[in-house]
């Protein structure tokens, strides 16, 4: 008979047991469930709610079970439904009637809320560390490439010259914000719900603050309905994970393009590429492509939980059992993605000569040419028009701006002088952009220094 089966006259159908059971996936919460139960039993004994001798037996029994879980010695059972009932059943089998007192003042509703909050805190912490590792890799690459000229793009068209360091620091800022989002998700999860009961608290004099202290929570929930009814803290994790995967996917898209023969900006390390079963010459950026593909999977996990929660009346509903698989899948996908991406990034070879050559084409210095005229007193809109005409002329003549003679330039506007040629070199175009956040090497160095301080 089920632990809750007192009011039922027959056992649940086997089909229901199979459909209803969550032990296949919530066994992942075993350590959190047992640790939470140890804290709960400790508090019950301290408060005199159950005999201290029974509390001691429960704690000792749970610690033995926890050790067996870590050693892989436990077999979970579908007919016990979930991790909570599996642990309680096993405990009672091992220590006898004292185990029946464990659930005093507690419901599975607040118990599972506790478990997933504890797991979410761990997930946020590990993700934060992985992002820190990625941020350090970006800083290292940026530091080594302060003067590596490359084209910046808009609409995937060459736009203006920048540096590889500046490009890496753009992603640094994105992933730094991602880390901040996981820190915020941690704070949302760091609220202890035990004591909420099924929905209306309990008549027992529980010391909720003591349980929070034992489990390392900074505060307790302030409303028993809210304590069991919401999973917004998981949605915050899933949202942060989705945004982080989006940033990874964008980065991977660029690396995929850059590794192609059309760009040839990077060479993927052999350890992070694959071949073709039919084409002997192929070296495919499969790792980057898989991360890009798995991003949609994490989006799906977010939408799964949003959809589960959107129509639920207060308080707990069985629909909420569906939170865990989406959460676990997103966590696993993100962890694997961050781990392999950071390792891959550190092995990439950047072809600096190809990047520099690419920057010199496509009239990336056209804006600087217009700015040159502005410094000579020409209104910007007039300068813009003149340089546009110059570009059209160059296209007709198959020339770059720096290929034009001074006489040719002056035929478009008399403000051009001999110093224009120094101003239009790729390095000069970059070095003149010396406001905070711009690509001039000394400005990027300031960003790198600030980034290291932020870590």
Model-derived regions: residue spans:
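Conserved hydrophobic residue
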Residues: 49-50, 74, 263-264, 379, ...
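Short, well-ordered beta-strand elements within core beta-sheets of diverse protein domains
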Residues: 42-50, 119, 166, 235-243, ...
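Short runs of predominantly hydrophobic/aromatic residues within well-ordered alpha helices
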Residues: 37, 84, 88, 234-237, ...
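Glycine-rich cofactor/substrate-binding loops
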Residues: 1-36, 97-98, 279-455
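Generic, well-ordered alpha-helical scaffold segments in large soluble proteins
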Residues: 40, 61-68, 90, 94, ...
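A helix-coil-helix interface module used to build multimeric assemblies
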Residues: 1-201, 206-208, 212, 274-275, ...
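Charged, flexible cofactor/metal-binding loops and thiol motifs
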Residues: 116-117, 121-124, 128, 143, ...
